[in-house]
Amino acid sequence: MATMAPGCLLPIHYHTGTAEVYTFSGCWRYAEYPDQPQTAGDYLYEPGGSVHTFYCPEDNTEDTVVLLWMEGAQIGFNQDGTLHHINDATSIQHVTETVSAAQGTGPVGYIHGGAAGVVKS
């Protein structure tokens, strides 16, 4: 689940696998598809390899809240086409745990790769 303020802009990127997005509130779009705004109640399926630039319009009157499901890695680029980032399950877990610890929101439950596990709340 992600919450983004009006004006949020992510670097151009693609996913090596599929991505699915369900929008709970607000509005977002891909810059490459300005005629396809996603608003509360919308579901988007995105095939792997689809290149796009995610943004929330600056004139949104509320935060945009989405549930994201991604398979594989996310590969992001700078405006000049150079590599900006590679996010995968391991890097996302690290960032999530680091931010959670900094905010004091408690441990984040994960089933770690290599073995089945139980997430305790």
What function would you assign to each model-found segment?
Residues 25, 44-49, 68-70:
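Long, hydrophobic, well-ordered secondary-structure blocks that form the structural core
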Residues 1-11, 40:
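A short glycine-rich, His/Asp/Glu-containing loop-to-beta-strand
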Residues 13-15, 52:
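Histidine-centered active-site/metal-ligand motif
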Residues 6, 15-33:
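Glycine- and acidic-residue-biased ligand/ion/polar-headgroup-sensing regions
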Residues 57-121:
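Double-stranded beta-helix
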Residues 1, 22, 65-68:
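Ordered hydrophobic segments in well-structured contexts
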Residues 20, 30-53:
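Short acidic-glycine-tyrosine-enriched beta hairpin
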